[in-house]
Amino acid sequence: MASLATVAAVKPSAAIKGLGGSSLAGAKLSIKPSRLSFKPKSIRANGVVAKYGDKSVYFDLEDLGNTTGQWDVYGSDAPSPYNPLQSKFFETFAAPFTKRGLLLKFLILGGGSLLTYVSATSTGEVLPIKRGPQEPPKLGPRGKL
């Protein structure tokens, strides 16, 4: 199909043998030039140019905004949307848990105290195999176990 379009673009009044009518008669098919001509576009290979990649310079101290990104987009100078009393509560009581060591100690003490409480309140005979039979066995239909 593409070769047919290129022939039509080159020769406007071309006649192609054997395409129309009977192949035995050899009737000729005339092709009208198409309005949209096929124009191949020249493709040039351009190298990729980085803004800060010239001469192995990837970090520009004069232009830190473009080098590292605009970090002030994420910050906000607006007042806190939370209640001041709520903010004060969490700043006061959550401050000891900001350090990993203090949080780990709290979890160890909490887990140890929970384990101590559960072991002190549980009974030793929880499993039925340790309790044994609670009632005498019932005899079967023939008087046997």
From Swiss-Prot:
Listed Pfam families: PSI_PsaH
Organism of derivation: Arabidopsis thaliana (Mouse-ear cress)
Protein name, per record: Photosystem I reaction center subunit VI-1, chloroplastic
Record family assignment: Belongs to the psaH family.
UniProt record, GO biological process: photosynthesis
Cellular component annotations (GO), alphabetically ordered: chloroplast; chloroplast thylakoid; chloroplast thylakoid membrane; cytosol; photosystem I reaction center
SS bonds (residue pairs): none
Transit peptide, residue positions per record: 1-50
Subcellular location: Plastid, Chloroplast thylakoid membrane
Membrane topology designation: Single-pass membrane protein
Transmembrane segments: 102-118
Coiled-coil regions, chain positions: none
Domain of life: Eukaryota
Underlying gene: PSAH1
Alphabetical list of InterPro entries matching this protein: PSI_PsaH
Major subcellular site: plastid
